[in-house]
Amino acid sequence: MSCGSPQVMMTLWTLTCVGLILLGAIRLSLGLDYDLESFDYLMEDNPEEFDYKDPCKAAAYWGDIALDEDDLKWIFKNKSNDLRNTRHNQTHPTTDNFSEKLGTGSQNETSSNLNSKKVKKGSRLKLLIAEKAATETNSTFQVQTSNDRVRRAATSRTERIWPGGIIPYAIAGNFTGTQRAIFKQAMRHWKKHTCVTFVERTDEESFIVFTYRPCGCCSYVGRRGGGPQAISIGKNCDKFGIVVHELGHVVGFWHEHTRPDRDEHVSIIRENIQPGQEYNFLKMEPGEVSSLGETYDFDSIMHYARNTFSRGVFLDTILPRRIDTSVRPTIGQRIRLSQGDIAQAKKLYKCPACGETLQDSSGNFSAPGYPSGYPSYTHCIWRISVTPGEKIILNFTTMDLFKSRLCWYDYIEIRDGYWRKAALLGRLCGDKLPDPIISSDSKLWIEFRSSSNILGKGFFAAYEAICGGDIKKDSGQIQSPNYPDDYRPAKECIWKITVSEGFLVGLSFQAFEIERHDNCAYDYLEVRDGFSEDHALIGRFCGYEKPEDIKSTSNKLWIKFASDGSINKAGFSANFFKEMDECSRPDNGGCSQRCVNTLGSYKCVCEPGFELTADKKSCEAACGGFITQLNGTITSPGWPKEYPTNKNCVWQVVAPAQYRISLQFEVFELEGNDVCKYDYLEIRSGLSSESKLHGKFCGPEKPEVITSQGNTVRIEFKSDNTVSKKGFKANFFSDKDECSKDNGGCQHDCVNTFGSYICQCKNGFILHENGHDCKEAGCEQKLLNAEGTISSPNWPEKYPSRKECTWDISVTAGHRVKLVFTDFEIEQHQECAYDHLELYDGPNGKAAILGRFCGSKEPSPVVASTNNMFLRFYSDASVQRKGFQAKYSPECGGRLKAEIQTNDIYSHAQFGDNNYPVQSNCEWVIVAEDGYGVELIFQTFEIEEESDCGYDYMEVYDGYDSTAPRLGRYCGSGPPEEMYSAGDSIMIRFHTDDTINKKGFHGQYTSTKFQDALHMRRK
């Protein structure tokens, strides 16, 4: 595979890798598989021109191990050397795959023969890997002994450490709000447990960018410097644990299993490694790493799992060695930082031994030893970090420090930001309590130092986050309290934003998830065009859809967030900035007709019947027009001749209110195929170019009849400057739409039918008894109908995150539930560990499981063994898909269990409502426990009568199948009395032909103790 075509080779839990810290050279962590054949671009003449900021273009780009800068220089330095000089004669079990892939000959091959072969670009890169692999001993069965202290690799080059532990970041715009929340949760996790700080990038030269590169899941290890560097979160990598792992590489960690001493702790089973992935298991040299005094960490979040890059899910590639005689340690967790990870990061960044990161909305801290007295030469740092848009109130309730001039010896410094270079809010000592200190933003830095021998009791301080407030700056961010975690109940926050005079306020949402309600009655975000609650309402928002970008009409914007005391969601994150209305300029933005302002820009548009010229500002007469007729015909320019090139025609068709417009094509022939890249016809409901799109059409195939959603249609035709075709001819006509007025009285969807209409509810809601309103169906449904359809929440749209839904399906007694899937698309995972659908063979989740499903392949039909089936659907916090739809129905027959209590059996699922169906063949086996027999009695019996019961009939056998003695064949009014089995089972067979059908039968069965008189009475 090339850099442009990554492929996930293992399931996410096999992408686990845990960690060492980078040694001086740039190294890259990936969780993907790439073919060595595709690195031709590494053989260019100027290595200095490579973009190391993009992991895909760096030399370090292979799987989970990579080359460093020195390796890359080695490649170019030796580019013209004889391939035979690269240890071609060296053989080793671990290099067989490389030799075979490289096409290397035997050891006796001459240099001239080798040189006569055409050397493919990139082959030297492969030989470098082979050379490194060849230096290792086979660690599957051998253990290296060493008296050296256990190494845990850490960078020895200070330029790879982020100065002050500050890592600026930016997030690319193509990520969803849920993904952004996961990134921030992962960064908060690192901040909470170490002294590393992630801050949104402002003007910093070096920073990381969350992006989606072709390398999939990858990152540089440590700070690259000199500009942005990518941390790629590719497909299926947007999980909390995986992002924490990738951030570990950014901080400076490398993979644990590549340590020089790894063979003392794990065995590498090379024969189980996927071909081409052997380089992921190479060891680092002892000279490449320095020790931080930390032992090998099986629990590290940077460690590979046992089957990473395995030929099969159940084959180990890394096997932990047993500690003493105990069980093997678990490796590959992706839940949280281990204690070893935390300890090593603190050593790498020289974190103070005293202090912590405080992220709760309120809390307290105190000097070490308080109130008994702090020790001399103490250094502590506390970092308070709350949600953007909140401020921090800091109160000192006790203060007793050695007092000196200018607080030179013992002191507390409070800074208005995330580090020691932030603005100083106060330097405190002595015993005088300061006034409450309020931050200007969402972070405070508190540093305590003692250097005197005269000690005091210390201090005690408490803080609280307050949301809302006046914000006077040209750009910034606001978030719901506690974002990206769920917001807190009973909160009210009001922000009053003011930007510079002469500008407007722009508001753009990155994430939005607030408790849903039709009228946003419970939790909501309210935005007003001004500086108070009395100004014009722009919108009140809730639910899961991000609001459109918002723009004020002045330099002020009022925002209110409110939550009630019950359901809490992830909340929102939004950026605000100053915005200019270019269309308000005297020259109308340079547009000859209409100027439309957009956030951050503007565009020129033309009136109907005109089109933009090449300068995108002027308008000229065009084909198309404004049509108000109820019926008519529209044709391409020049019809019936070929249409001209370089045409752009727009027709706007308007019918009276409560009418819909249908468009039917007689002829259609445009250049192109299904891509519609050159000439095309675009049809929308509405009059603007951003209205709902019905379709974009080209080629020779006529579109189906298209009906508008309202009383307007926009038809746009475009041709390029080359091929012309015959064009199109279409007839339009109008029909009254009852749904267009007040939505037909329907709360959700009104569906117009010919001469009438019906109301429908969105998925997750059910229609009220009044036929118009909708009520929430909830996610726990008990289904008692004989048959029906179920679907995931919001189907066919993407299901919501963090959802758990259950369905308890119960069909007619004596029948089995059959489930057939008609649509299926759930996040893929080899073990369905994330989003999944579970089916159980009974009325609840304690029954035997029938299967756990995910992915995009429709499962085969599933049949329960009884008349109950239980379904549970679960979605996690990240990837969402379309979901599923399935139909359930009763399947006659099956194996039934006779118990002491009476159970029912019916001839068909619609018994009592409809006669039994024709051409049916059903078999039931009723089984009792050992020592018990089966008693069968019929309450109702009505089957087509015939003297020999040759048409429709019921047969009863004294055993498990038709080889057992037959107790009788019955039709008409059925058996005259109850029946008893001689053993522990009875089989019932019901057959109908293709003609007359009757009411059917209703039987009851129980288990009884064997009594000879009863059980032999049938004889």
Swiss-Prot record:
Residues 153-352 form the Peptidase M12A domain. Disulfide bonds join C195-C351, C215-C237, C217-C218, C354-C380, C407-C429, C467-C493, C520-C542, C583-C595, C591-C604, C606-C619, C623-C649, C676-C698, C739-C750, C746-C759, C761-C774, C779-C805, C832-C854, C892-C922, C949-C971. Binds 1 zinc ion per subunit. Its EC number is 3.4.24.-. Residues 354-466, 467-579, 623-735, 779-891, 892-1008 form the CUB domain. Zn(2+) binds at H245, H249, H255. Residues 1-31 form the signal peptide. Residues 579-620, 735-775 form the EGF-like domain. Keywords: Calcium, Cleavage on pair of basic residues, Developmental protein, Differentiation, Disulfide bond, EGF-like domain, Glycoprotein, Hydrolase, Metal-binding, Metalloprotease, Protease, Repeat, Secreted, Signal, Zinc, Zymogen. Residues 32-152 form a propeptide. One of its GO terms (cellular component) is extracellular region. Its main location: secreted. Residues 104-116 have a biased composition (Polar residues). Glycans are attached at N174, N364, N395, N631. The active site is at E246. One of its GO terms (molecular function) is zinc ion binding. It is found in: Secreted. Its cofactor is Zn(2+). GO terms for biological process: cell differentiation; proteolysis. Protease which specifically processes prolysyl oxidase and maybe also chordin. Required for the embryonic development. Predominant protease, which in the development, influences dorsal-ventral patterning and skeletogenesis. In embryos, inhibits the development of dorsoanterior structures and ventralizes activin-induced dorsal mesoderm in animal caps. PANTHER family: METALLOENDOPEPTIDASE, OVOCHYMASE-RELATED. This is Tolloid-like protein 2.
